[in-house]
Amino acid sequence: MSKTYHFIGIKGSGMSALALMLHQMGHKVQGSDVEKYYFTQRGLEQAGITILPFDEKNLDGDMEIIAGNAFRPDNNVEIAYADQNGISYKRYHEFLGSFMRDFVSMGVAGAHGKTSTTGMLSHVLSHITDTSFLIGDGTGRGSANAKYFVFESDEYERHFMPYHPEYSIITNIDFDHPDYFTSLEDVFNAFNDYAKQITKGLFVYGEDAELRKITSDAPIYYYGFEAEGNDFVASDLIRSTTGSTFTVHFRGQNLGQFHIPTFGRHNIMNATAVIGLLYTAGFDLNLVREHLKTFSGVKRRFTEKIVNDTVIIDDFAHHPTEIIATLDAARQKYPSKEIVAVFQPHTFTRTIALLDDFAHALNQADAVYLAQIYGSAREVDHGDVKVEDLANKINKKHQVITVENVSPLLDHDNAVYVFMGAGDIQTYEYSFERLLSNLTSNVQ
């Protein structure tokens, strides 16, 4: 039976994906959010989903209301009105936990790589059989007839605890979100609690020391590059400017050669996890092989464009591990070009906690440009760290730039520009694109 859903904070990446999925399943969907443009809203607009400003008049007791996790009575009029008037609502993760019970569910968790891996698994499985999915880049697809449900499983504030999927991948465990987690051990404990809720199969990266300590009542399958100790092993790697080719073995059995048109060693591991899960779940590997070849990636993960013959890459990387992976992918695809990193640190707490690691990661580029730190709505800038503190630790050519003046980026010939961050780094990218376009106009 069709329902009416109202999303408080519909432009959030998970919220927009869920809204799209429910819309495609035949439900009436609307939502509210701030007026500022966010990259997820284009998909909502194309689907004809109404986006309203926050207003208590948006709420109706007959609706099923889903609220974004960032909103509280003290910062959102709709939440405040709902609480004052006894109107019930569910948080995103609470709704998702109950929603997935009607499907064979497959989750993807991990400190890094979960969006790309969720996208890859969704792409392959939806081409094999009817599948609904939610990806953290704001993409969602729903089918009333789907048996399978693929979703991204987020560890922040332990939001994944309402989830009990049949299968799950955990890509890695790393210290992140220092505004919530107190230590690597705290992060591990969250993932270990999640792992205990998997019912049929858990697939973890076997070369991650923390993941080796994971326990679960479900069978655990390890994947990696090393033959010893891993169940699914990727070997015979061929990394070229058109993608990556590799062979996968399962406990000594050759499962064949696979190709992905994406870049970086991390994507080979993501694909190995997907292959392992689908093989274990009983899917035809020939179909898996065929559809991996057409996976082009997800939004804001190594997204490329060319402006005035200049290659620009946009990536959500906001943790040192992710920066290293993104720069590795750029070098694979563009081995003869200078790799220029343009990075905006995201949150003061993360920048303080990982300052030396950020410097080490950014030193993998040939030149580094830094934008001012993007503070989260959850924190206050106490002046404990500035972007110049990071700049002082970088030993490659580096400079702090402003969105009003990105012209220093023009000092490079034969370069690829990699814009990275989870804040508003795209405003710097767009400023650079306008500068490049104006150069073309002036020449003409």
Swiss-Prot record:
Pfam families, per database record: Mur_ligase (PF01225), Mur_ligase_C (PF02875), Mur_ligase_M (PF08245)
Location(s), subcellular: Cytoplasm
Principal subcellular localisation of the protein: cytoplasm
GO MF: ATP binding; UDP-N-acetylmuramate-L-alanine ligase activity
Binding site for ATP: 110-116
Keywords for this protein: ATP-binding, Cell cycle, Cell division, Cell shape, Cell wall biogenesis/degradation, Cytoplasm, Ligase, Nucleotide-binding, Peptidoglycan synthesis
Pathway the protein acts in: Cell wall biogenesis; peptidoglycan biosynthesis
InterPro entries, sorted: Mur-like_cat_sf, Mur_ligase_C, Mur_ligase_C_dom_sf, Mur_ligase_cen, Mur_ligase_N, MurCDEF_pg_biosynth, UDP-N-AcMur_Ala_ligase_MurC
EC number, UniProt record: 6.3.2.8
An annotated GO cellular component: cytoplasm
GO aspect biological process, one term: peptidoglycan biosynthetic process
Catalyzed reactions: UDP-N-acetyl-alpha-D-muramate + L-alanine + ATP = UDP-N-acetyl-alpha-D-muramoyl-L-alanine + ADP + phosphate + H(+)
Function: Cell wall formation.
PANTHER family hit by this protein: UDP-N-ACETYLMURAMATE--L-ALANINE LIGASE, UDP-N-ACETYLMURAMATE--L-ALANINE LIGASE-RELATED
Family: Belongs to the MurCDEF family.
Name of the protein in its database record: UDP-N-acetylmuramate--L-alanine ligase
Organism whose genome encodes this protein: Streptococcus pneumoniae (strain P1031)
Organism phylogeny: Bacteria, Bacillati, Bacillota, Bacilli, Lactobacillales
Gene: murC
